[in-house]
Amino acid sequence: ESINHGINLDRQVSLQYLYYLDQIGLSISPLSNNFLFRKIGANPFPKLFNRGLNVTLSTDDPLLFHMSDDALLEEYSVARASFDLSMTDMAEIARNSVLQSGFEEDFKRKWLGEEYAKGLTFCDELKTHVPLIRAKFRAEHLALEHMLVHLIAANKGKSVLKEMMTHFGLARDAHRNILLNNLPDLESFPEQNQL
């Protein structure tokens, strides 16, 4: 599941959070947006990417908005320069593109690895060029957010949030342990394999 553009999502924080939790893909075209909606400097792409949303780059009306023969490469080049993206960021964005694509499973396995469908940490680092530590960071934070939502739904959210606020500023592992200590009463959820 994905949508094109989605640049107004930065103004709707609660909806943005739901997109993050469900990892709904956002395919954004900064060059097109630059001409039609927002200048590159105001484009929310880097903010959405840094927050862990499933964003990728795309083209939109390449004959109108692009100057080169390879519109998608142009989008990647402009995004890298404009948003100060690292090569690891670029690899993650490209991986997201394959994940969001409508290509057949065989194609995705070729570019992401045999077990990619199990989750981000199962993508083959040698194929995606996304370091395992980055994939683990993204996957673990997503799983922790899902745990928190499950605890809130089970009416344990207040006490857990209070305990987390008490330990605010501590290492992420402290928050992870607080969530895990409160989780045994809950049913399992799909993201547990990412912890």
Please annotate each region the language model reported.
Residues 1-4, 47-55, 76-89:
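Structural recognition of alpha->loop->beta junctions
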Residues 10, 78, 84-194:
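Mid-to-C-terminal alpha-helical segments outside catalytic/metal-binding sites
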Residues 4-6, 38, 65-69, 83-87, ...:
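Hydrophobic alpha-helical scaffolding
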Residues 13-19, 36-46, 65-78:
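Histidine/acidic-residue-rich catalytic or RNA/ligand-binding cores of hydrolases
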Residues 1-37:
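Active-site core of metal-dependent hydrolases
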Residues 10, 27-29, 33, 40-49, ...:
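Hydrophobic alpha-helical bundle architecture
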Residues 51-71:
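Short acidic/histidine-rich active-site segments
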Residues 30-36, 59-62, 75-82:
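Short beta-alpha connecting loops at secondary-structure transitions
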